Amino acid sequence: MARSGSRSDNGLTGIQLEHIGKRFGEVTVLADLSLQVSRGELCCLLGPSGCGKTTALRIINGLLEAETGRIFLHGADITNVPPQKRNLGMVFQSYALFPQMNVFENVAYGMRRRKLPADIIRQKVTEVLGIVRLPGIEKRRIHELSGGQQQRVALARALVIEPQALLLDEPLSNLDARLRADMREEIRRIQRELGMTTIYVTHDQEEAMSIADRIVIMNRGKIEQTGTPRAIYENPATEFVSSFVGNINLFNGTIENGKLSCLGAHFPIDPAIMNPGEVTCALRPENIQFISGGSIRGVVREVSYLGSIIRYKIGLQHSTETISVQTPATDAAYVIGDTIGMTFDPKDLRVFPRNQ
């Protein structure tokens, strides 16, 4: 490992990872991972199971040791600093609350280990329970709380020590869908209120899209793309990102003589975008429109009513391929067996090299 030290702090960087590498046996979990999170930013690490996102979080917190690279917090090198001295708040997937302690004792735990005066501890516990909207429950036992209340207590315990940054490892995965949505809003409110630098790990794309200032898409120990939720969704940099974030149609195409051939139709394409040859095309279901004279023809195979939207599965004529189309529920509805025409704006199409 690199030796500890510091670097010039411009006052803007909260957490910085430089060339982090980690292996478990023969398996490379993180490969030369570099990341910078600004102060006050909520950054989501998003990716499938095994992509390295939780490993990265535990390396930042000091629960795991990286084999290569350095970690900086507000400009200070904390690579070799013990976990308890890194001044980071951590919320685990399991909450890690102490069942034998009441709420007050759980929240006060970190401050008591730091030997703060009793009156200061009481004051801070009261303040932080107010922030997470759980006033007056100091004497309640953990088993008396709902899942959402336990999550708030875990968050209060992480915040009460006034950390320089907050780390959350899939904190909502044990809650039902409605409570997850409510807690996302609460975490975002608290993070903004405190201006807390936050790294939030999740495999749930909706969770990341709704809560993050910036999303980091991880795959096989590497970063595939970094950007705002909108940039990630509308301009995926790789085929993996396009298929992992949101619903999307992936289908084969061919570029030749300045034209893209796909879905039985032909479209002009800028030669600078992609070399001639076979490609994979990506198109969001909501970017396809039904139109009677559309050059793409198909037959409705499935219809799913989803409240505000209707999702269709369309079998393409003269092809074994199917595509999904999503329309507002207020639009004219089609039924299984209908033959329809479709079109889309070529600017909404993303093209990637085949087998990228």
Where would I find each of the regions flagged by the language model?
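Helix-to-loop junction immediately C-terminal to a conserved catalytic motif
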Residues: 61
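Conserved ABC transporter NBD signature motif
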Residues: 69-77
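ABC ATPase nucleotide-binding domains
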Residues: 42, 83-89, 93-240
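Non-catalytic connector elements of ABC transporters
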Residues: 2-3, 248, 259-356
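ABC ATPase nucleotide-binding domain
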Residues: 16, 36, 72, 341-343
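Pre-Walker A (P-loop) beta-loop-beta motif of ABC nucleotide-binding domains
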Residues: 33-44
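The feature captures the beta-strand-to-loop junction immediately N-terminal to the Walker
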Residues: 46-48
